[in-house]
Amino acid sequence: MSIDFSNAVVLVTGANGGLGQEFVRQALARGAAKVYATARTPRAWDDSRVVPLALDVTDAASIDAAASAAGDTSIVINNAGVTTANDSLLTGDVAELRRVFETNFFGAVAVVRAFAPVVKANGGGAFVDVHSALSWWAGTGAYSASKAAFWSASNSLRVELDRDGTHLLGLHMGYVDTPMTAGIDAPMSTVDQIVTAALDGLEAGEYEVLADDVAVGAKQGVSAPIEAAYPSLARA
């Protein structure tokens, strides 16, 4: 199912910066009539087509209020996400681990649940679920686990949404140059590269976009022996 942005109404979660901000910019550039730019505390925008809207993906009442306020939405960019300084599943603070899952998994799924009837009522439309190469490689603890869980949920949601004529695209990528990756010394894609790949894929009707070589390699690694992905586990 190809998706046309011409005169579409788009809602972006986590829109204050990073990938979210770029999704807002590119949706408008592709012809969207309106973009709801959501965040816990939404920023001001200098474009009248952008509507700042409060949305905390960890708060059910906030999600429901946003779904009611943005009842003309036809495309949802499910982008909000968090990480934590110590996300070790063995030693990380349990409250912090739960916070990561509340945003990256439960919050993201809650957004789809709340907006699915809205998108259906507006002609079917689409969701873009922003995942990570870490959906398939445990480079971190809680963050990787939360993204793996969300990837699995998106696969289930995709089948359910398709029955109502709604498309779901999953986006995977390695490191992206955003505030979340500040201080990480590794090759990174730009937000422009990742969002362009995602929206090109959505317009083409793709189910999944692997936006860089890191994501491609991570998915291929799922079918490889465990030792190939995690060399420290290799036995002499």
Give short role names for the model-derived ranges.
Residues 112, 146-147:
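Active-site helix of classical SDR
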Residues 47-60:
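Rossmann-fold cofactor-recognition segment
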Residues 83-98:
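Conserved mid-core segment of classical short-chain dehydrogenase/reductases
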Residues 72-73, 119-131, 163-167:
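Active-site loop of short-chain dehydrogenase/reductase
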Residues 112-113, 155:
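A short, exposed helix-loop element centered on a Lys and neighboring polar residues
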Residues 16, 20, 24:
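N-terminal Rossmann NAD(P)H-binding glycine-rich loop of SDR-like oxidoreductase domains
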Residues 170, 178, 182-224:
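C-terminal helical subdomain
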